[in-house]
Amino acid sequence: MKTEVKICGLKTAEAVERAVALGASHVGFIFFPKSPRNIEPDDAGRLAARARGRAKIVAVTVDADNDGLDEIVSALDPDVLQLHGSETPERVLSIKALYGLPVMKALAVREASDLERIDPYLGIVDRFLLDAKPPAGSDLPGGNGISFDWRLLDALDGSVDYMLSGGLNAGNIADALALTGARAIDTSSGVESAPGIKDLTLMEAFFEAVRRAEA
């Protein structure tokens, strides 16, 4: 499969094993108490051991302090840190210096002007995760099952390395790939039967849809 696929918000051994068997390039574990996909660092570490060496391990955090990051990095030994809060470029630099890990910075997109927020992070983050801006009043910065207008990415400089996220599922991934040319994609709620509950059948359908889109 040419497209990198990240399955995020994993909480069970069965889901981790299936994601990797289907061809996931990345598996994500979410450390954010307000999320239905939240997982304790030690539990995530045990699950990550099932994928290590076959998929990249991603720790997803939201404005975590150094003590929180220390615990997560120690337990999970991630390949990538995904920062999904309001972390500034300065904070990203500090985190990279502390842990020596690649950083993927999530940015919320609803309109063209939101893409201007990429510029201050260029040369600092290793990759962006472009997600849909959450609805008003939502406690979750991601995993809300909504998409943004993918045509906005037409204006994006082709040198910007990003992973596309936001409401991706088996029914829309072909259009998303065709419109954006994205080489890396992320899904969480799109392969769930309920918030935080991964559905293996939906996961299989998602990978099959990606393969058909690539054909």
Swiss-Prot record:
Group of enzyme by EC: isomerase
The EC number(s) this enzyme carries: 5.3.1.24
InterPro entries linked: Aldolase_TIM (IPR013785), PRAI_dom (IPR001240), RibuloseP-bd_barrel (IPR011060), TrpF_fam (IPR044643)
Gene Ontology molecular function terms on file: phosphoribosylanthranilate isomerase activity
Keyword Membrane tagged: no
Keywords recorded for this protein, A-Z: Amino-acid biosynthesis, Aromatic amino acid biosynthesis, Isomerase, Tryptophan biosynthesis
GO biological process: L-tryptophan biosynthetic process
Pathway participation: Amino-acid biosynthesis; L-tryptophan biosynthesis; L-tryptophan from chorismate: step 3/5
Keyword flag Amino-acid biosynthesis: yes
Catalytic activity: N-(5-phospho-beta-D-ribosyl)anthranilate = 1-(2-carboxyphenylamino)-1-deoxy-D-ribulose 5-phosphate
Annotated disulfide bonds: none
Family: Belongs to the TrpF family.
Protein name: N-(5'-phosphoribosyl)anthranilate isomerase
Encoding gene per record: trpF
